[in-house]
């Protein structure tokens, strides 16, 4: 999409198809330069990633200011255990693809990244999967912020975190978990796919 919009305000007809040089192939709006700088380089570095979700949501953005990874303090947080990168070189609005390259490098082969002082980014082989990981990560950021405000959270063991991650963080589980949210969105906005 060419402009920043809430997910509830995006329709299929507003989407742009952009080539690797930033030229609009389909659609009639201008390209969001910052989005192109991040997403184009991410897709170039990670051909397995068909979708990436990123916004400046309140809990992800707040958690990103801590400059650290999510801890495995809950079952849901275990989905991101040893599966998150961190980009610590925030220098304002991303305008150059070189910074997009650095963000892709920080993500590495992981599913998600924390962009320090900026927000969170999640990936997947489909939009559904990337969005599910985004929604889940946002809630995990919220939970860890609340837990740390209340005291010192206790992490689960490495073995438990790995076992839990393998069970809940696979693409099939993520896709299936997102379907009720998608159904609700389509029910609320039947013209979404127009």
Where on the chain are the PLM-derived regions?
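A conserved C-terminal secondary-structure "cap"
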Residues: 111-194
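Short beta-strand-to-turn element immediately C-terminal to the catalytic PLP-Schiff-base lysine
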Residues: 17-19, 63-64, 122-124
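Single conserved hydrophobic/aromatic residue that forms the stacking wall/gate
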Residues: 1-11
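A contiguous binding-surface segment within folded domains or other stable secondary-structure elements
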Residues: 85-121
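Structural motif
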Residues: 23, 50-53, 60, 78, ...
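Glycine-/small-residue-rich beta-strand-loop submotif within the FAD-binding core of flavoenzymes
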Residues: 9-25, 72-79
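Short HxH-centered metal-ligating active-site micro-motif
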Residues: 19-61, 97-109
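Class I SAM-dependent methyltransferase SAM-binding "motif I" and its flanking Rossmann-like core
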Residues: 58-95, 99
